[in-house]
Swiss-Prot record:
Signal sequence interval, chain numbering: none
Name of protein: Doublesex- and mab-3-related transcription factor C1
GO cellular component, one term: nucleus
InterPro entries named among the record's database cross-references: DMRT, DMRT-C1/C2_C
UniProt source species: Homo sapiens (Human)
């Protein structure tokens, strides 16, 4: 297959700088992207070639404005284009720079005392929940072995008449009972 004869090629240089498409013919020493259009031999349609400078062009954030322009594949502004190419121009506006320190998660500092307090509160709630589960699961126990109204405090001395403990039939034996505080409501006593 024979190579086609070499013909002079006219090139129109379109420069994209800072996101705007311009038709200027000069080259700047900035990082920029060039669009070259060159006609092919024996065809009315030209080839579209893209070239880029060695340094990458960093694009900032959007908003985006779109503009459509007609470009003749032959590059000749006087001749009507056979098949026009439609190019969209993106105009990007810079946004605020992001500081790496601002991207790190901002966690409030909690004191050790607050952590210990939260842990002990959680531990008390866990123990109370376990006690309630044990109480629920012990439904087979005789009714006199569980006392929900027994106070957490030991009974007053025999000479003190201010507090009267519950009747002896509901009072658990001291050696086999366990009392758990459940907040403002009182205590749960579990008997084995």
């Amino acid at each position: 297959m024979a190579a086609p004869p070499k013909a002079p090629i006219r090139v129109r240089n379109l420069t994209i700088r800072a996101g705007a498409l311009t038709g200027k013919e000069n080259n700047m020493l900035q990082p920029e992207t060039h669009i070259f259009t060159a006609p092919e031999e024996g065809s009315s349609q030209g080839a579209l070639l893209l070239g880029q400078a060695p340094e990458p062009l960093s694009l900032p954030c959007t908003p985006v404005t779109l503009e459509q322009q007609l470009v003749s594949p032959s590059g000749d502004p006087h001749r009507a284009p056979a098949l026009p190419s439609i190019c969209s121009t993106l105009i990007l506006q810079p946004c605020a720079t992001l500081d790496p320190l601002l991207l790190q998660p901002q966690v409030p500092k909690v004191s050790d005392q607050a952590l210990v307090s939260a842990h002990s509160e959680w531990q008390r709630k866990l123990e109370a929940a376990e006690a309630l589960l044990t109480l629920r699961n012990s439904a087979q126990a005789p009714p006199d072995s569980i006392s929900l109204h027994q106070p957490c405090n030991p009974p007053a001395p025999a000479g003190d008449k201010g507090f009267q403990p519950p009747s002896p039939s509901l009072r658990p034996r001291p050696a086999s009972s366990i009392s758990l505080p459940i907040g403002h409501l009182g205590c749960i006593s579990l008997l084995s």
